[in-house]
Amino acid sequence: MLRLFNTLTQEKEIFEPLGDVVGIYTCGPSVYQYAHIGNFRTFIFEDVLVRYMRFKGYKVKRVMNITDIEDKAIETAKTEGKTLRDLTEYYSGVFFEDMKTLALLDADVFPKATGHVPEIVKIIKKMMERGFAYRGKDGSIYYDVSKFGDYGKLSHLKLHAGKKKIKRDEWGEDTSIISDFALWKSYEKEDGEVFWETELGKGRPGWHIECSAMSSKHLGKRFDIHIGGVDNIFPHHENVIAQNFGAFGENPSRYWLHCRHLMIDGRKMSKSAGNFYTLHDLTGKGYKPMAIKYLLLSMSYRKRLNFTFGELEESSRKIEKLRLVIERLKKTNGEDDAEKIVMKAMKKFELAMDDNLNTGKALKIMEEFADEVSQIEPNKVSVEKILETFRSFDSILGLGLF
């Protein structure tokens, strides 16, 4: 029985789907820079969730948005002398190549924010009609946080009053303030050619409203799971809940899942701190993509993971050992019966995954299983059962063992 830790309730809850198809919305990449391996820790966790749900027989529809309009993207395009479209298409292409390199499954839909402006306008109008949004003196349209009594329940923070209104996508160093936030940003000359002429006026969408528009279009007003990194909890996901309540009267998602940070030398890996590695950085040093993936799965997504090259070397050795065990098995034709070993390993693996996708424990179980089968000479039937068990593990973890 699958249990997932719900950020909203701060409890592990039995997963109960809302309908026949499990709807999952992923906050995808902001495509103004290369994604680093800390970003990919979250995307790998999400990939494993989808794989495991399908393994358990669920039908899944996964939507991963592409954030191709935001303050930082506009600023970066201007600095690099590129159009916003050229910039975001380049980094989107790199991201998709990285996904393939890491053997991540494609989402069912990859919606772009720039392709959903009509939906964004419609939702904002609905919020204005319902009294949750207003036009500021600067011409921008803001969400009135005072109208939503549950604001702050996702983040569980002690929030305090900040500025009356915040127009920028990010709120600076202070991430525990209550402020009205921009849904539609009125045009400024710094925006250059990035604007839309709509019934809301000349301008562009705020960052938070994009996810409300894309999730509701592709998954409906209410779906099963909303996923992201812990940095998304506040203000982004808090604001998404507020927006959806303002437009539709309900929280969009039943379960909210968030992946913890990847650390490096005890500090959060981030673009702003400049202490990050991209997939290309590490493969350029000779490390194989699946070893990197193995390391990123080596601890539960609910715990911080500290990246070191020593741990990466160890992950390289572990995955190579698994491959050698599998290759040896393909040539084995002994007399030992491995049915009990297989059944025990599969049961333990599923228990670990059912416990909030504990991939760290699942990897250890797979390693122990490899050690056990290495000590016997299984017969032909047992060899097939062992290999099938490894295939099941691999179909869930996506490590390319076959």
For the regions a language model picked out, list residue spans one by one:
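Alpha-helical recognition segments enriched in aromatics with Gly/Pro capping
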Residues: 1-32, 47, 118-328
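N-terminal, positively charged nucleic-acid-binding surface of large information/translation enzymes
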Residues: 9-103
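Short catalytic-loop micro-motif centered on adjacent basic/acidic residues
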Residues: 62-63, 108-111, 226-228
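Short, polar/flexible loop-turn hinges at active-site or ligand-entry regions and domain interfaces
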Residues: 80-86, 107-109, 304-306
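N-terminal, positively charged, Ser/Thr/Ala/Gly-biased leader segments
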Residues: 97-131
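Structural preference for alpha-helix termini/caps and helix-kink/transition segments
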Residues: 276-402
